[in-house]
Amino acid sequence: MTAHDQRLTGGPAIAHRIGPNAILQLIPVLEAAFGPGAADRALAAAGVPRPGPESGMLPETQVSTLHRWLRDTHPEEAPRLLREAGLATGDYILANRIPPLAQRLIRALPAFLGARVLATAIAKHSWTFAGSGKFRVVSGRPLSFEIARNPVVAGESSDTPLCHWHAAVFERLFSRLVWPHVAVRETACCAKGAPACRFELLPKGR
């Protein structure tokens, strides 16, 4: 049942959620960039509660609000900081969410097969980073993903793609397990008016 269906039937609306690392990994990045207490000040200014280290899934609106606050308040630094947070999120996933045996198996496969296995796993767990958006693998060669109605940039308007955090997460996972020199390029973005944010993986880099 969709949120729209629930409104029609009088049921509660769905609170779509995203994994806490979309905020947790940004906290040390903000502290490193702007000094002690910077993360708490940012969260307070954005009106977002600070998640604890054992937080479960967070409302996607908290993630989008903090990311948008950073882009609005620090437009020059935001792409780099969100990228750093995305790389750290990828490191967390590798350390805590993908079993070592699975990682060894992916690395042992020919790259095109390893990429397919990893992409399938990402799609299976896309609810953790796409929230109310819809993730799908668009093509295999070149490997491309998209997140339709990406909630992390909901309501944004920009001349350039904004999904530095998502792109960096994908980059870290594929660089560690499949293509060491991979680059991830966002070729379409909801913030630019596209129906989906699309990411193209370049195995040999840019």
Curated annotation (Swiss-Prot):
InterPro entries: BchJ, NO_sig/Golgi_transp_ligand-bd, V4R. The keyword Phosphoprotein does not apply. Pfam families: V4R. The keyword Glycosyltransferase does not apply. SMART domains: V4R. One of its GO terms (biological process) is photosynthesis. Pathway: Porphyrin-containing compound metabolism; bacteriochlorophyll biosynthesis (light-independent). Keywords: Bacteriochlorophyll biosynthesis, Chlorophyll biosynthesis, Photosynthesis. PANTHER family: DNA-DIRECTED RNA POLYMERASE SUBUNIT I, SLR0144 PROTEIN. This is Bacteriochlorophyll synthase 23 kDa chain. It comes from Cereibacter sphaeroides (strain ATCC 17023 / DSM 158 / JCM 6121 / CCUG 31486 / LMG 2827 / NBRC 12203 / NCIMB 8253 / ATH 2.4.1.) (Rhodobacter sphaeroides). The gene is bchJ.
